[in-house]
A protein has these predicted regions:
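The canonical Cys-X-X-Cys-His
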Residues: 91-101, 151, 179, 191-201, ...
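Short coil/turn and helix-start
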Residues: 88-89, 188, 249
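Post-cleavage N-terminal segment of exported redox proteins
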Residues: 8, 18-75, 112-177, 203, ...
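Short Cys/His-rich "knuckle" micro-motifs
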Residues: 104-107, 204-207
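N-terminal, post-signal-peptide region of Sec/Tat-exported proteins
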Residues: 65-96
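Long compositionally biased, domain-poor regions of proteins
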Residues: 81, 193, 212, 241, ...
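Short cysteine/histidine-rich metal-coordination sites, predominantly Zn2+-binding motifs
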Residues: 109-118, 210-219
Length: 278
């Protein structure tokens, strides 16, 4: 199309000329975006960080603000029941080890966390399944299952309002940097990076919807688009598919490293779990 001459253009039929014109407009728009885009993503200053909550409509904010109106609370209620349910060969419940759920206050704010038994960081859902296999002698809950999301949401609710505070030390630093590399790396057929949207262009819109800063402050959360609760890994997979990139398998180290970086990137921001998003 870039070599289409005026004479060739005029010889096209009306419908074909219209199509060709649209393609030219798309190409020119794409070129202007590329030229306007900063070459290197810049980290958002702490004073300018904004939760996805601040980009939502008043109606959606009201849904998150009122537990009685939030559909996410259906999962939290299930999680409360699961917290007290005995399971596995050990016939133990979460409460048998941890007593009241309030003992989990601050846990979500600290995850993903380094697990010395495997020498890698793990996220909260993986920690729940480790407890099931090691303490309850039960089978792991399927990733993205209602039960696992419910437990993660119930545990996460105990940290609501607390500042995110993942560890940044000699054990986690290399994994945080690995997550940063994924965040800033161009991927997929669209040759986009996470940072281009969420660091450089968060004041803009995409298909009429606000581009947020991408802070992972409320997972697992209820997404109106999904009509269900979902994990941060599910959201990351959606983004990769949108970039026309190959998504990783659930629980892949790349996802956990990216989760860790995103929580480090949101350090100091309050936990919103279980959040609601459009």
């Amino acid at each position: 199309m870039s070599k289409l001459r005026c004479a060739d253009f005029l010889r096209l039929g009306t419908n074909n000329r219209t199509f060709a014109a649209l393609i030219l407009v798309v190409l020119m728009s794409a070129a202007s975006i590329v030229l306007a885009r900063p070459a290197i993503a810049s980290e958002i200053p702490a004073a300018e960080r904004k939760s996805g909550y601040e980009f939502m409509s008043g109606e959606t904010r009201a849904m998150q603000d009122d537990d009685a109106a939030s559909p996410a609370m259906l999962w939290v209620l299930d999680g409360k029941a699961l917290w007290n349910r005995k399971d596995g060969e050990a016939n133990k419940s979460c409460a048998d080890c941890h007593n009241e759920a309030s003992s989990m206050k601050g846990a979500t704010a600290r995850y993903p966390a380094f697990d010395k038994s495997i020498g890698l960081p793990i996220d909260l859902e993986q920690r729940i399944n480790l407890c099931r296999t090691e303490q309850q002698k039960a089978t792991p809950l399927p990733f993205e299952s209602r039960e696992l999301l419910a437990l993660a949401a119930f545990i996460g609710q105990q940290s609501r309002g607390m500042p995110i505070s993942v560890r940044d030390d000699e054990k986690t630093r290399s994994f945080i940097e690995a997550g940063r590399t994924i965040f800033e790396r161009r991927q997929g057929q669209l040759n986009l990076s996470c940072a281009q949207c969420h660091d450089d262009n968060w004041r803009g819109k995409l298909a009429g919807a606000p581009i947020t800063q991408g802070h992972a402050t409320g997972y697992p959360l209820y997404r109106l688009e999904w009509q269900a609760m979902g994990s941060l890994q599910r959201r990351l997979r959606n983004c990769l598919v949108g970039m026309r990139a190959e998504p990783y398998a659930f629980n892949a180290p790349e996802y956990v490293n990216l989760e860790l970086f995103l929580m480090w990137r949101a350090r100091g921001m309050p936990v919103e779990t279980p959040a609601v998003r459009p």
